[in-house]
Amino acid sequence: MKQVEAIHTLRRWSLRDRVIFTHTDLRKIFARDKEPAFRAGLAALVRAGFLRRLTRGIYFYALTDKPVPHPLEQIAVALRRSCYNYLSLESALSEYGVISQVPLAGITVMTTGRAGLFDTPFGRIEFTHTQRTVANILDHTRDVGRPLPLASVKAALRDLRRVGRNTHLVAEEELAEVHPDDG
């Protein structure tokens, strides 16, 4: 992998608003390289600061000249690409204004994949496993024009109660006033 060619390739991807990559994505982008050359090239791009390792197996093209919208959500999608994921728990309830504190350090995501915590330079991503069916997830989330769908108020509250934490932060009166018919 020649560094100049790699930078040009990554720049072309960034023009299409793609700046967060998995290791597998990069391997496909640079498929012509033999494995040792790919590994060496990837390490050189990271060392030179052109790519930034965000967490294990996730990289960010650092030369982008555009702001990255919802980077934590993009990283979450990349980390659990083969799973159904949605913004829920404290993150969703905060967006709806029915929780008394705003989560500042990261996002809370429900996933059909494995639970886990990932610390990145953009903040923390907390995955909580759900056994909900895909149909149930689709019925209780909505597309809000971002990488992750958003749980309905009722679903986020149900998720919060199911995991058994921070229920004391929910302003029940606000929930009843603002979202009486949410489903």
Segment roles from a protein language model:
Residues 2-80:
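Short beta-edge/loop segments at beta->alpha junctions of small alpha/beta modules
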Residues 62-183:
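Nucleic-acid-binding surface
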